[in-house]
């Protein structure tokens, strides 16, 4: 049995190294795409940025805009950097998802508490190095 993906959560990508550029970039997303900014984004001291809300989805997929240049302060290494461009998926059960990744021989790493006290994010790469994130919600 494979992962039980419930939907796309977000796509995260870097927007440069200067936090003072965030308002102008946010304005671009608001004005060009008519998208709202998620006001519930927590302050992440090591990753300034914004979450752009996308419409018409139960999970409400987002663009995560992250300020970073080179390896981010939140990273454990260049490879294990949560600010790398990635696709985040919502899964039904994160424990089962990790078991499945282990069963199929996929190495992963976990960030706990990065975006909230009880948050767990599982990251792994596809064979070509594209980064994926798994989270369980509700």
Which residues fall in each region the model found?
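Exposed loop/turn and edge beta-strand positions of beta-sandwich/beta-sheet ligand-binding modules
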Residues: 46, 83, 118
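Vicinal oxygen chelate
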Residues: 1-9, 40, 98-138
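Conserved short beta-strand elements that form part of the metal-binding/catalytic scaffold
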Residues: 36-78, 124, 131-136
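Short amphipathic alpha-helices within nucleic acid-binding modules
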Residues: 23, 95-100
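N-terminal beta-strand motif that seeds the catalytic metal site of vicinal oxygen chelate
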Residues: 1-26, 85-87
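Helix N-cap motif at beta-to-alpha junctions
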Residues: 18-19, 91-95
């Amino acid at each position: 049995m494979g992962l039980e993906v419930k939907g796309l959560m977000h796509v995260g990508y870097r927007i440069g190294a200067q936090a003072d550029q965030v308002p102008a970039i946010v304005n671009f997303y608001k004005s060009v795409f008519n998208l709202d900014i998620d006001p519930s984004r927590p302050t992440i001291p090591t990753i300034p940025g914004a979450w752009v809300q996308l419409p018409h989805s139960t999970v409400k997929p987002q663009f995560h805009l992250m300020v970073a240049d080179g390896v981010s302060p939140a990273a454990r290494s260049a490879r294990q950097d949560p600010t790398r461009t990635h696709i985040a998926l919502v899964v039904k059960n994160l424990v089962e998802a990790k078991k499945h990744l282990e069963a199929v021989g996929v190495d992963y790493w976990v960030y706990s508490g990065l975006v909230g006290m009880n948050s767990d994010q599982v990251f792994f790469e596809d064979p070509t190095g594209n980064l994926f994130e798994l989270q369980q919600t509700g």
